[in-house]
Amino acid sequence: MKQIHDKDAVRKRILSVCVRLFLEQGYDKTTPKQILEEAKVSASSFYNIFPAKSAVLSVLCEFMFENQFTFAGAIVGKEASGPLLYGAETAIQLTLAEMNEKLREIYVLVYTEPSLLDLVQRKTAAELPRLFRAYLPEYGEREFFELEVGTSGIMRSYMASKCSEEFPLERKLTCFLQMSLRAFDVPEDEINRVIQTVLSLDIRTIALQVMQKLFSALEMRFDFKLANE
């Protein structure tokens, strides 16, 4: 039984170090050597639990996406329409990526690496029927998953492309919502209302509050403290 507890303790220590380093200095800049040194574990112990650094990221990814649409519901109301909940949630994600380069790196990797992408697509696809069934009543789980495959690709592209004077955040959100909501057969007048509502929000302040809550939740879940807080 001691061996099981020891393995659990090593896993927890690795996760604590990795999540902190990913958020403080970025995923790519966090080397396996640094992880081993700070977690005080051997290479064999690490790879016995996590076959690769990306496997650690899958645990972080699952935590980040397990409460999708919770923040959006708190902002626009739990009784808001499905398209508005979707619009607010995706706008928050896009804004988070724009405000924090470490989060952008994590999000883009999550939407790129096959195993991580599959995890996110399946989690998001499970939410889509309750959001868009009224617009696509004939669609089942397979069809909604197929739509998520496409819209997640759109999300990745907009996250990876940084805003500029020529392409400000408001324009990015508008373009993304037009393309994604049309995919779900939402009427144009309703799409326009969703975009107007999202753009009327102080989305940067909201994203900052969400980021602070996310970081606090990660600190509690993985037992670490971020530097420079």
Residue spans for each PLM region:
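Generic hydrophobic, amphipathic alpha-helix propensity
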Residues: V10-C18, I35, L60-M64, Q68, ...
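Hydrophobic alpha-helical connector segments
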Residues: V59, T70-L103, E113, Q121-A125
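C-terminal peripheral helix-coil segments that are non-catalytic and often amphipathic
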Residues: R133, S164-E229
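Short alpha-helical functional segments enriched in proximate histidine and acidic residues
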Residues: L21, N67, F71, L96, ...
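The short coil/loop that forms the "turn" connecting the two helices of the helix-turn-helix
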Residues: A9-V10, V41
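Secondary-structure edge/capping motif, primarily at the C-terminal ends of alpha-helices
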Residues: A72-V76, R104-Y107, Y158-E166
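Helix-turn-helix
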Residues: L21-A55, V59
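Amphipathic alpha-helical packing segments from all-alpha helical-bundle domains
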Residues: Y111-A160, F167, R171-Q178
